[in-house]
Amino acid sequence: MDIIKALAKELDKQEEHVSNVVTLLDEGNTVPFIARYRKEMHGTMDDQTIRTLADRLQYLRNLEERKKEVLSSIEAQGKLTEELRARIESAETLAAVEDEYRPFKQKRRTRATIAREKGLEPLALLLFAQEKDCPAPEEAAKEYIDEEKGVSSVEEALAGAGDIIAENISDDAAVRGALRDYAMKCGDVCSEAAKKDPEDTVYRNYYKFTCAVKSIPSHRVLALNRGEKEGVLKVWVEVPHDNALELIFRRVVKKPACASTAFVKAAAEDAFDRLIEPSLEREVRAALTETASEGAIGQFALNLRPLLMQPPVKGFVTMGLDPGYRMGCKVAVVDGTGKVLDTAVVYPTHGERQKAEAIRTLSALIKKHQVKHIAIGNGTASRETEQMTVELIASLGKGAGVSYAIVNEAGASVYSASKLAAAEFPEYDVNLRSAVSIARRLQDPLAELVKIDPKSIGVGQYQHDMPEKRLSEALDGVVEDCVNAVGVDVNTASAPLLARVSGLNAGVAANVVKYREENGRFTSRKQILKVPKLGAKAFEQCAGFLRVPESKEVLDNTAVHPESYAAAQKLLSLCGYTEEDVRRGNLGHLMERLHGYGEERAAQACGVGLPTLFDVCAELKRPGRDPRDELPAPVLRTDVMEIKDLKPGMELKGTVRNVIDFGAFVDIGVHQDGLVHISEISDRF
C-alpha cells in the first residue's frame, strides 16, 4: 500500500503536502509548529487536520507492519500463494488482514482439529468439492470407519467431516467479510432488562429496545454498553438468520444437484450458528463501540476547546467563591495577576444571621482590595451563594461597579488536592485552594485549566467509558493546540502552562521557571536558549509560541518566529514602516501598502511564501494579540433570575455548557441549564 497516496485520498489533500507533513512529523516537529510555521509545505492544513493525518499515518504503518508479520508467518508454513499475498497486500484494514490470516493461525484443539487427527479431512474435501460423481455422504463415509483412529460409525465420520467443513467455511475471509458487511447493513442491536421485574432506572428506555446497526446513534451504543456493564441490561446483535445462510450458500454451494450439497449446507449452517455468529456479534459491537467512542472523544474535544479558549478577564482584582453547605463558602481574593491577597470562610446557608455576617465579611474584603469581579463556582450551594452575591452587590451601591459570573468548577477539587496545588499553596487549606482556582478561572481560564487533567473537567458524554489512552491523547492535543494558539508569556507562565508549549515538556518547563527565579525575567527570546536542556531543536519548536513583552525586540512579543524576523523587517521596510511604528500601533495602512507593492513580489523579496507573509502582517498589525479576545466574553451579571421569571418569546444571552448528540445545554442564569434540541439547531439530525 502506498501510504502517502492512501492518506491524500482519504483527507482530500495533495500527495506532495501529505508527504511533507509525514516528513516533518518523522523529523520530530510538533503539530502546532507544523501548522503555524510550515504552511507553505502543507497547503495551510490546520492543527486538527494534521493530528488526524498523524493518527491515520500511525494506523496505516501498523497495518503494513502487521501485513509483513502475517506474510512471514504464512510463508514459513509453506502455504503462501501469490493470490493470497496479493489479497493481504491490498487489504485496507486490520480486520481484513486478520480474516486472511485466520486459517493459518495456531489454533487451540477444536472439533475440526480432532476430526483431522482421525484422518477425516479427505472425506471433508471430497464432500465439499461437490463433484458430479460424488457419492452420497453415507456411502463415502464408509471408507473412513477406523476403530483404531476412533471412528466407529458412518455417523461419527460424517460428524467429523462436517466439523472440518464448518471450520473451513468459518475461516474463509470472503465469507466473513461478506457477513460482516451484511451485519453492519442489515443487523439490529437489541436489548432487554437483565432481570424479570426490573426497577425504574435511567435505562428504562432500553428494557425492550431494537435499533438498526447502521443507524444507531453513538450515545445509545454507549448507554447500552454501560447498562450491560452495570448488570441492568442484556444486549445482543441480531442478524437475519435465513438471509445470512443464503449469503453463505451462494459462496459454498457449487452444484445444487450434487449428492453432497445438502450435507455442505448443513455444515454451513453449523458454521454460522456455532462459529461465525458469536464472533460476528463481538466484531459488530466492537466496531460500534469504537465508532461511538471516537465520536464521543471528538465531542469531548469539541466541548473542551471553547472552555479553554474563553476570553480572559485580566487585570482586575477578583474574588473566588467556592460554595458549600456544611463546610461553608470558601473565599479567595486575587490581584490582577492571580496572586492571592486574602482568604476567608463564610456560612451564608446557615441561617439569616450567618448570611448577614457573610455579606459584611465579603463587603469588607471587596472594599479593602477594590474587588471588581466575583467568580462563583457552579457546584453544590451555588444557587444560594449566587443569591447572597446579588444581595451583596446591591448593598455596595450602584457606584461600586462590581459584577459576578458563574464559573464551571469541574476539576477544581481535583486540582486543590494535587501535588501541584500543594506546592503552589502549601500554607492554604485544600478548600481555599479551590476558591483561588475558581477566581483564576475567570481571570485566565486557559492558564488555570492546564493544571488539571482534561478528563476531570467533565465536558464530555460517557467520558469515563472511553479508552483512557486514546481519550488522553485527544484531549492533550486540544490543550496543546489552544495553548500554542494563544501563546505564553515566558516571564509569568506557570510550569504546567509552559509544559504544554510546543517543543517543551514538564522537565524543561521546570527548568525555565527555575532559570527565571535565579536570573530574573527574560529580556529576549534568544535568552531562552540559556535554559538547561533546552537545545536548538526545542528552541525552534517553542520560540514562536513564547512571548517576551519586556524585550527590546518588538517581534519577541508576537507570534512571528525568529526565523522570519529578517522577513518581517524587510516587509516593514518595503512598506515604509519601522519597528517603532509596530510598537506604537501605526500600521493601519500596512495591507494597503502591501497590496500596492504586490503580495507575490513582496513575498519573493522577503524570502517567504504568501501564507507566512500574511501571518507576519497580521502579527505586525496587532503585536501581542490574543485570539480569545475575538470570542464572546463571559456573561457578567449583577442580578439573578428565576425560572418563574422566564416567559415565552424572551431572548436571553447564555453560555453553552455542553454539546451532546441530541443538542446543547445552555446556562441562561436560572440555575438549570436549558436544552436547545438538535431540531432547533440543524436541518438534518
Annotate each language-model stretch with its function.
Residues 49-52, 59, 63-320, 324-428, ...:
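Duplex nucleic acid-engaging cores and interfaces of nucleic-acid transaction enzymes
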Residues 242, 271-279, 402-489, 494, ...:
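OB-fold/S1-family RNA-binding modules
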Residues 1-19, 26:
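Generic start-of-chain signal for non-secretory N-termini
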Residues 34, 119, 322, 374, ...:
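Residue-level signature of catalytic and energy-coupling elements of molecular machines
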Residues 332-334, 665-670, 675-679:
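Short, acidic/hydrophobic/Gly-rich beta-strand patch recurrent on exposed beta strands
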Residues 659-664:
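Short, conserved beta-turn/loop elements at beta-strand boundaries and strand-helix junctions
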